[in-house]
Every structure is written in structure tokens, then in C-alpha cells.
Amino acid sequence: MLFRSLLDAKEYGVGKPVEFRWNQLLSFDACVQCGKCEAACPAFAAGQPLNPKKLIQDLVTGMVGGSDAAYAGSPTPGLPVGHHAGEPNRPIVSSLIEADTLWSCTTCRACVQECPMLIEHVDAIVDMRRNQTLVHGTVPGKGPEVLANLRETGTAGGYDKAARYDWAVDLNAPVAQPGKPVDVLLVAGEGAFDMRYQRTLRALVTVLNKAGVDYAVLGGDETDTGDVARRLGDEATFQQLARQLAGTLANLTFKRIVTADPHVMHSLRNEYRSLGTRYDVLHHTSFIADLVASGKLSPKAADALRDKRVTYHDPCYLGRYNGETDAPRKLLKSIGIQIVEMERNGKRGRCCGGGGGAPLTDIPGKQRIPDIRIADARAIGADVVAVGCPNCTAMLEGVVGPRPEVLDVAELVAAALE
């Protein structure tokens, strides 16, 4: 396995319009200002200072030179039109685009999903974040603390990594060992340190035990995948963490990785490939659905859910990023749940607000993104919101006031096996 030890010049991000790749600049110029990205953006809906349409138009303005005074669309929330200008070789932040605009993005890719011109808004935002982080060192909120924790401890919270699997001590979950092959390697992710999400992981292990799966947990050697570091623009820390975790995995023998965290799945399945690795990585809902389909699990309808209206919230990094929207629904159907869909679902599901490091940068708006998503669930009379991501669990459960119960799909399946 070969990793590059130094960042390329382009990996330090984009600080001026001229530093974007030519094909990015061409795509920005293709914008027809239809506003579909604006209508889909969760940050814009929450009143945070991000309008993806305005951002793209600002980048076009910056490349040709001039001000944003002629922009006729909806303004960026809280930022009046006519106060920003740019030039091809002039710094983007904050003459053309405010730093808070970049840090408001949850990287959910709803804008990209809707764009008829296939513009990659999120990639452009992360490019500009890299310049802010690696060149200027201006990550807001708790971002600097978390990045330091990741570099020093391999965990976002600065925890002792040996405690990552404390939740499994009474479950007889085997720990992966060099020289002991297993079919499935369970990678828990950062959610393992959260007491609420530990219930999800315990439910998942219970399901694996019930099905007789040959598995092992990664154990105390597990370190962060680097997802948050990359979203916050710290490419150097991402590559450091990727080398560390990939080195750990290289010492083990397994057929596939299963994880309950779509961010972990996306990093290992897709982003580590550029670093020279290839893993077969499954989300836990896909893996459990396969167990049910093969007859290794025979769940029954849970009595406690018989009269409940259940909806499913699609995690952005599972649905939009990796195209998996059917397996969780098939799995819920197999335990007798008839899903009541929210208006925005599947690949067009609304973001919970938990991705892209957004809870760390914490840019204020008029309301919270998870409040909007819970309002979607309330609108259809949902009693339970089924989820498949630790970030979604934390964000939706953090909504204040009466709300539907939030349960991971693994918890619902485990209840159906009792």
C-alpha cells in the first residue's frame, strides 16, 4: 500500500477564482439560475448565510471581475446584494464570499442532486474551505479543537481510543486479531463514544449474534476515518488518519466491512480508493436486509410498533452519496412496518444538519435544520422516525419539544427478534 507523504499544491485549496480547475469554472458559467439548488439547500431554508445559486454566481462574477450588484435572485440570508466584488486573482474570502457562507454548508449535496447543469457546488465549497483551513487556519467554532483531537488522539472528542468498544464488553463481541480471518469486520465509528448511539451498536451486535454471523469488532485499534477532517478542509489530517486506519486494516483478514455510520462507509468505500485501498463496505441496513432475504434472520412484526406511524429519514451520505435508499425500506417492511413517507425522501431527502462539520462550525441562522426535518415528520403524523446514521440520530433527537421517537433501523429489527 503506497501513500503520498506530502500534499500537492492543489490540495491546499482555492483562495482565488483563477485557482479553480478549468472544468469547474466552465461548469459555474453554465449555471442557468433556475434556483433548484437554492430551494433544496437546508442551510438556506434555515436562514443561514448560504445560497448555493448566489455562491455560484459570485464565483462567475469573480472570474470576469466586478461586483454582485447586478444579481437579481434571492440574496444570501443576512447578506445584502451589492456589497461584494471580486477579480480573478483577488482573494475570494471575504471580498467576494463571506467565510460563514462556506462554513454553513452541511455537504449534503442536495444542491448537486437538483442541479440540471451538474454543477458540483459542494466540491467548490470544500475546495475553498481547504484554503481557509490549511493556509489561513480560520476554522470557526469547535472545529480547531476537534481537528487537534483527531491529530493527537485519533478521535474527534479527544477520547482514549481503547474505550471505543466499552459498550460491547457484556455482549461477547469478538475483537479482530491478526491471523484470525472473519467474514465481517464491524467498524463502529465516532458514534461509539456517544451513549445514545451505543444503543444502536448494541442492537446491531445483537442482530449479528442472532444470525450467527462470523464477525469481529475492530476494537481499541480503531481510529477515526478522517471524514470530518476532510469536510472541514483539513486534507493533511484526513490523509494522516487514512494512513493510520488503513494500516490497521491491512493487518487483518476479512471479507467485508459493515458499519452503521454512512460517513464511515463513504470514506472507506469511496475516498480511501485514491489512497490505494479497496474494501467491500456495506451499511448495516443493507447487510441485515441480506440476512433476512437469505433466511438467516426471521424477524416478526413488533407489537409495540403495530399501531405506530413510522417514517424513514434518508441519511445524505447513504442516499444521495451512495444511492442506497431501498434496503432500509425493504428491511422495515420485513418487520411489518408500512412506511409513511415524508415529502422529501429517498435521494431527495432533506438533510438533518449533521454533516460537513456543520454542528462544529455552528453558523447561526433563523432556525435549526433538524427542526425543519422534524416538522416534516410531524406533518405526516409520524410517531417514529427510523434512521440509519449516528449524526441523524443526534441531530433529530436534539430537537426541543414534542417530537416523534427517533430509532435506528437496527433497534427496530432487534425488537422484532425478541
For each feature predicted by the language model, list its residue ranges.
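Acidic, Ser/Thr-rich low-complexity segments on the non-lumenal side of membrane proteins
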Residues: 5-45
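Iron-sulfur-cluster electron-transfer modules
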Residues: 17-28, 50-56, 63-276, 291
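A glycine-rich, aromatic-flanked flexible loop/lid motif
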Residues: 30-31, 296-302, 340-351
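Short cysteine clusters
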Residues: 31-37, 41, 55, 105-111, ...
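A short, charged/proline- and glycine-enriched loop
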Residues: 179-184, 304-310
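Cofactor-cradling patches in redox/metallo enzymes
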Residues: 191-283, 317-418
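Short, surface-exposed amphipathic charged segments that create phosphate/polyanion-binding patches used
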Residues: 293-308, 353-359, 418
